[in-house]
Amino acid sequence: YGSFGVFGNHDVTERLLGGFSVASQAKEMRDPRFDEFAKKAKIRILDDEVMLIDDAFYLVGRKDAQKPGDGTKNRIEPEVILSGLDKAKPIIVLEHQPKQLKELETSGADMQLCGHTHDGQMFPGNLTVKLMWENACGYLKKGNLHSIVTSGVGVWGPAMRVGTDCEICPITIHFQG
């Protein structure tokens, strides 16, 4: 089927100071090097797109909530992007930030796969991140939605982690019924 992905909030051209992004622009554009990398790596980016895979399940990729990277602040809402899908088939949502869990669940999504939080990256962020996100890292079941958030391998700001681990999270999915 291939490799699929979504862009995140730091995949735009932005000014950095000490590794931290500063002076956020209203209409940030995706850095073209990310598109080139994805193409060379044969990663299909789903940018507010839905794919039906092997007539068996849906893969939905959402634009980043904070910085879509296309010069807008818009992305398609869960109830719109999931409308018209056959809800008898599993619906897996790829999204950089673990947002809108309730909306995804009520719109029929079965699973949401995310990153973004770095699990706080360093102390005390590894403690406070849990106040900001319903699922800051790990697994959470909300109604019929399974939310999985990985701490990832990247960093934001200083190139270090304290109190969190880098991870690539293999997931095995078994469809029933």
Say what each PLM segment does.
Residues 1-177:
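Soluble catalytic domains of enzymes that build or remodel membrane lipids, polysaccharides, and related
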